[in-house]
């Protein structure tokens, strides 16, 4: 396995793990079927392309056409980053902050029209809203350049090309690890236990005086804020944003596959699911034509991954609905103390 292949696997693992962790909180813990997950990733791209790029244009005094202006602005900032790496780090931090705030607000607003719906209708409504926003971003050139796309800053302009992939992969992995620690801490609190209770039986949660709508809004706001971080990292890695890159297949359905494969409600299981998916995905992308000629597949190999992962999704739902690492029961500190007392006796 080549060095570049390993760095690509690590990079995609980090990106998808961030998205899948946020989806695991929404779906695995809270039971919200967020079929519009791609929207939160798109929001991260909007924060970079629609807000950060405009700020750079203002800073360098560049006017005129938005798409052309971003090209000049990113070229100017890249030259600055190449001589001063701190600027690149600052842009990354600023982009993450902007995306998190925007994602939090959009996530809360996103769920409002459908927060009181049952699971089936809720999932369909979220999908419809997400697709509508994607279409608007695709055909409105003033948001993120539409189908033409726009340039984004190269935060690693000071790193030579042969090492850029590795450095960016480690940055993404580090941020993914921080996100993992955040969710482990958050979901092992009373808030996380309430989300599990809401997933199992909303009426029970209502009986204890908790507002289901407020819980859903909080969950979606946090999940969207984290999902937007993945959008930022992806946009900065590719140094280009195009709306068509944020489809429901890549950023909604495949993350659902990873969560279900690893085990919903279990962040460690999700990591295993993401790793399995990413390894297969990267290998298929690289060797798809070799597989086509070796097996004599009578269709274009570009569709092979969609077919394979679609069949895998059905097999998981039918034979292994709990995933590779099933969710563990909740054991609170008082319960642990009681168990230790009993075992001691």
Swiss-Prot record:
Membrane topology term: Multi-pass membrane protein
Record's keyword annotation contains Cell membrane: yes
Keyword Lipoprotein found: no
Entry's localization field: Cell membrane
A single GO BP: amino acid transport
GO cellular component, one term: plasma membrane
CDD domains: TM_PBP1_LivM_like
Main location: membrane
Spans through the membrane: 3-23, 42-62, 91-111, 124-144, 163-183, 222-242, 269-289, 297-317
Pfam families xrefs: BPD_transp_2
Entry keyword set: Amino-acid transport, Cell membrane, Membrane, Transmembrane, Transmembrane helix, Transport
Top-level taxon of the source organism: Archaea
GO terms of molecular function: branched-chain amino acid transmembrane transporter activity
Its biological purpose: Part of the binding-protein-dependent transport system for branched-chain amino acids. Probably responsible for the translocation of the substrates across the membrane.
Protein family per UniProt: Belongs to the binding-protein-dependent transport system permease family. LivHM subfamily.
Matching PANTHER family: BRANCHED-CHAIN AMINO ACID TRANSPORT PERMEASE PROTEIN LIVM-RELATED (PTHR30482:SF1), HIGH-AFFINITY BRANCHED-CHAIN AMINO ACID TRANSPORT SYSTEM PERMEASE (PTHR30482)
Protein name stated in the entry: Probable branched-chain amino acid transport permease protein LivM
Organism: Methanocaldococcus jannaschii (strain ATCC 43067 / DSM 2661 / JAL-1 / JCM 10045 / NBRC 100440) (Methanococcus jannaschii)
Lineage of the species this protein comes from: Archaea, Methanobacteriati, Methanobacteriota, Methanomada group, Methanococci
């Amino acid at each position: 396995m080549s060095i570049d292949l390993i760095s690509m696997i690590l990079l995609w693992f980090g990106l998808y793990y961030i998205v899948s962790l946020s989806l695991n909180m929404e779906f695995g813990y809270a039971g919200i079927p967020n079929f519009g997950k791609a929207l939160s990733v798109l929001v991260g791209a909007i924060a970079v392309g629609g807000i950060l790029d405009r700020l750079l244009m203002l800073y360098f005094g560049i006017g005129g056409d938005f798409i052309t202006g971003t090209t000049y602005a990113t070229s100017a900032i890249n030259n600055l980053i190449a001589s001063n790496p701190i600027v690149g780090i600052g842009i990354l931090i600023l982009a993450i902050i902007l995306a998190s705030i925007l994602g939090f607000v959009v996530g809360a607003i996103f769920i409002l029209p459908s927060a009181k719906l049952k699971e089936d209708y809720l999932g369909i409504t979220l999908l419809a809203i997400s697709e509508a926003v994607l279409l608007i971003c695709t055909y409105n050139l003033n948001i993120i350049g539409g189908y033409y796309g726009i340039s984004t800053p190269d935060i690693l302009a000071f790193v030579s090309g042969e090492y850029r992939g590795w450095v960016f992969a480690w940055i993404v992995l580090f941020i993914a690890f921080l996100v993992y620690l955040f969710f482990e801490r958050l979901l092992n609190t009373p808030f996380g236990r309430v989300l599990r209770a809401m997933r199992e039986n909303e009426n029970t949660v209502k009986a204890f005086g908790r507002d289901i709508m407020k819980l859903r809004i909080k969950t979606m706001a946090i999940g969207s804020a984290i999902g937007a971080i993945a959008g930022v990292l992806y946009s900065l890695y590719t140094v280009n944003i195009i709306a068509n890159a944020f489809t429901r297949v890549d950023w909604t359905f495949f993350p659902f596959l990873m969560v279900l494969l690893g085990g919903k409600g279990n962040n460690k299981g999700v990591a295993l699911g993401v790793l399995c998916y990413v390894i297969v995905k990267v290998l298929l992308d690289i060797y798809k034509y070799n597989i086509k000629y070796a097996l004599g597949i009578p269709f274009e190999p570009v569709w092979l991954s969609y077919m394979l992962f679609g069949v895998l999704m059905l097999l998981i739902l039918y034979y292994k609905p709990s995933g590779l690492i099933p969710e563990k029961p909740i054991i609170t500190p008082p319960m642990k103390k009681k168990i230790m007392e009993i075992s001691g006796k």
